[in-house]
């Protein structure tokens, strides 16, 4: 069934835009793609042709990264089909609608503004009478000021002693993303004299999780970040209660050890139970919140506001690349389209994300949520059932650990599992061992 969605730009008074939202299996380009000859990857990657393919099938990303898809089961004919699919599906136009502040989340009637936490890609976006980019920057600055005061010893515990540890209390997106980013940067920060405070994370409502963290830290010198957009998240408030009891049992005033990241309308916003409150809003989904105050508070305390600002700059540069109408120069869109091809044409049910870096040990779990929580649907945006699969199962572990566990199935099992390798030229600690011209062994 063909549907056309009319969307207006809320309080920006934009002209109305019209987009066709068609089920994937009804698109002519998708049907054509189904008939394109499948690639024999072994032949394609063998000999001189393989070496040339590795050079050809690579596209630059932001901050010196590169996306190489030579080992993906595509060729020029498949790529041409994917370009047609992107055009027919109006992907570039719909992405522009997102960052220009049109109502993309029609189910909840909300804008989708996570990209504004790291930069302004298009028009000024005003919602609820507020310039949202200015709002997010204001919160980032407030977090930076707070973190700097903590690091300088201007904000201390009751004994006038500096805080040395920060503990984030959250669940889902308020845990997975910030935790992955902290672990990714921890050793780099220590190596480069950027490290300020140890960070720990509590998310599981199983009290063993909180107990293990609390037993590993000095609570008298710890500051706790409670993250709940609504201020009513059961799991998070349960863990907060556990932490407050621990602080009380240690003879400490919990309100002198806790800050909140929440919405301006939540019961936490003006509570005396917190040293400070920093705000997010309903326009940022939890799984995309690492670049908002959700990630900003814990990462700024752990590494300093300057490091968090650099993180935002890198994300903003990648966002800009995602605007490119040329699919072959748009690594984010290209990878997504190849993923659709692998799942919906080739029929591969899962994708493994394999970072050859211990620092990215929790990055696959973060990507797992980003992809599977976003695409885990059985109906389209109009509530009609879909007759095709909507996404793969995402899983992964760092190499080389995975090589000695589930890689056996990847190499010799009967299922074909697409792989996403993440490798680096150098590690964070300067202790590389070069094997076969790569330090990511």
Where are the regions that the model predicts?
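Glycine-rich phosphate-binding loops that contact phosphosugars or nucleotide phosphates
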Residues: 145-153, 159-325
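Non-catalytic regulatory/linker segments of enzymes
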Residues: 117-129, 133-165, 173, 177, ...
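General structural feature for long, well-ordered alpha-helical segments within catalytic domains
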Residues: 26-29, 53, 74-82, 94, ...
């Amino acid at each position: 069934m063909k549907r056309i969605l009319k969307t207006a730009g809320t309080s920006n008074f934009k002209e109305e835009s019209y987009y066709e939202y068609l089920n994937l299996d009804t698109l002519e380009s998708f049907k054509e793609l189904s008939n394109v000859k499948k690639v024999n990857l072994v032949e394609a990657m063998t000999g001189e042709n393989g070496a040339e393919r590795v050079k050809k099938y690579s596209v630059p990303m932001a901050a010196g990264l590169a996306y190489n898809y030579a080992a993906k089961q595509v060729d020029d004919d498949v790529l041409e089909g994917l370009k047609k699919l992107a055009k027919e599906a109006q992907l570039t136009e719909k992405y522009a609608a997102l960052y220009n502040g049109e109502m993309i989340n029609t189910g909840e009637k909300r804008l989708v503004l996570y990209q504004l936490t790291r930069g302004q890609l298009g028009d000024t976006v005003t919602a609820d009478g507020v310039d949202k980019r200015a709002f997010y920057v204001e919160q980032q600055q407030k977090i930076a000021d707070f973190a700097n005061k903590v690091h300088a010893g201007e904000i201390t515990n009751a004994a006038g002693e500096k805080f040395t540890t920060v503990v984030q209390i959250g669940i889902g997106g308020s845990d997975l993303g910030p935790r992955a980013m902290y672990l990714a940067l921890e050793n780099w920060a220590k190596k480069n004299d950027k490290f300020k405070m140890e960070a720990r994370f509590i998310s599981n409502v199983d009290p063993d999780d909180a107990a293990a963290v609390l037993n590993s830290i000095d609570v008298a010198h710890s500051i706790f970040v409670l993250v709940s957009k609504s201020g009513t998240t059961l799991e998070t408030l349960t863990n907060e209660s556990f932490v407050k009891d621990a602080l009380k049992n240690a003879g400490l005033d919990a309100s002198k050890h806790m800050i909140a990241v929440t919405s301006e309308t939540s019961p936490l916003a003006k509570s005396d139970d917190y040293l400070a409150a920093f705000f997010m809003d309903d326009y940022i989904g939890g799984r995309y919140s690492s670049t908002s105050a959700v990630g900003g508070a814990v990462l700024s305390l752990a590494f300093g506001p300057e490091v968090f600002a650099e993180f935002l700059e890198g994300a903003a540069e990648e966002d800009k690349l995602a605007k490119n109408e040329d699919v072959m120069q748009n690594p984010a869109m290209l990878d997504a389209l190849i993923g659709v091809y692998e799942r919906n044409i080739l029929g591969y049910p899962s994708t493994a994300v394999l970072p050859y870096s211990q620092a990215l040990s929790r990055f696959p779990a973060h990507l797992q949520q980003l992809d599977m929580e976003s695409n885990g649907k059985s109906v389209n945006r109009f509530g009609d059932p879909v007759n095709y699969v909507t996404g793969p199962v995402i899983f992964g572990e760092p190499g080389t650990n995975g090589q000695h566990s589930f890689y056996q199935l990847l190499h010799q099992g009967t299922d074909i599992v697409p792989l996403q390798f993440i490798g680096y030229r150098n590690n964070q600690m300067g202790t590389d061992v070069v094997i076969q011209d790569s330090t990511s062994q």
